[in-house]
Curated annotation (Swiss-Prot):
This is UPF0229 protein CPR_1333. It comes from Clostridium perfringens (strain SM101 / Type A). NCBIfam families: spore_yhbH (TIGR02877). Residues 75-100 are annotated as: Disordered. Signal peptide: none annotated. Belongs to the UPF0229 family. InterPro entries: Spore_YhbH (IPR014230), UPF0229 (IPR006698), vWFA_dom_sf (IPR036465).
Amino acid sequence: MAIFRDQAENHVEHDRSIEDRRRHRQLVEKSIKENLGDILSEESIIGETKNKKYKIPIRGIKEYQFIYGANNKGVTTGTGEESRGDRISSDKRKAISNNKAGNQEGKDIYETEITLEELMDYIVEDLDLPNLDKKKYSEIIVESAAKKRGYQKYGVRPRLAKKKTVMCKIARKQGKKRALREIGEEAKIGRFPFREDDLRYYKVKKHPKKESNAVMIFIMDVSGSMDNTKKYLARSFFFVLSRFIRRKYNNVAFEFISHTTTAKNVNEYEFFHKGESGGTYISSGINAAIDLIKEKYNPGVWNIYPFYASDGDNWSEDNEKAMEAVNEISDLSNMFGYIELLPSTYSTTMFYRFKKEISKENFVSVTVKEKKDLWNAIKYMLSEELQEKNKE
């Protein structure tokens, strides 16, 4: 016997479009995360405002449908290990390749737009700042997020406590029923609208909290050996890192140092846009950071995170000084990060010497050989595993 169910009572549970929309949101978020590396490798990202938009390709979702197979004989069964979205067809027909015309249907691809601000939201999900140790005297009082502390009768509409408001209305209605019974009237109460007295709003209170003080020191080699591609990679690394940290933490100071054979403190705009030429003394940039730390940022009360980007091509007479400088700044810092860009020969760059001779646990080095390595380098520098390693 056929059974018919009335689905009109609850449209939400039987609305198929809800599941489609949920799958669509998942697909969009997955595509954005998969394309983060490509977005971060665009030169146009440096210096852009938070409203700058970037296009991301999204594969379309098709409705389920029955299609004709290859007319093969027999019936096949699954292994029981299939998951949603797996292709289980045994059809092995090959697509036309070598840029020749074919007769197979293509995949629907469309684009969605994401702003730089939204991009940072996705980066925040994957990255986290290395541990900010609680320095004894470096805590700053900042205002924390507002917390709900009870209810009140007056407030702004966004803070309306709907559940509490309904409960107040029900209590008033029950009170009216009791009053009618007491005077001998059992009249049925009809429509019972809300009144101003029923409204309840969340009482919000802000509590101050202490937040650790930190300084990020960005050091960049701008010598003649750092061509436009290398400088672009370095600036991309520092730009994304600075935007991420500013978004996630308050009261983080930034210092910018550029160097050739000599180093100088520059402002943020000059750091990301101005170029120079000349020889390379790696020690000059790191020593400038050391002097800055000793002058302004006492390691006993500050969390210090210097990051240095170079192609590793150093003047040979400066190599020993560079080694001494790296050891010293590592002793003064919570973590010192060294990023080597497009190294020509692995064994002849400073990355090789640093890796071999620097034994500091808080010294972290990575190489970026091409644009696509940039995202992985950022993730490695700021990974949670690295935090735990430094904490130990």
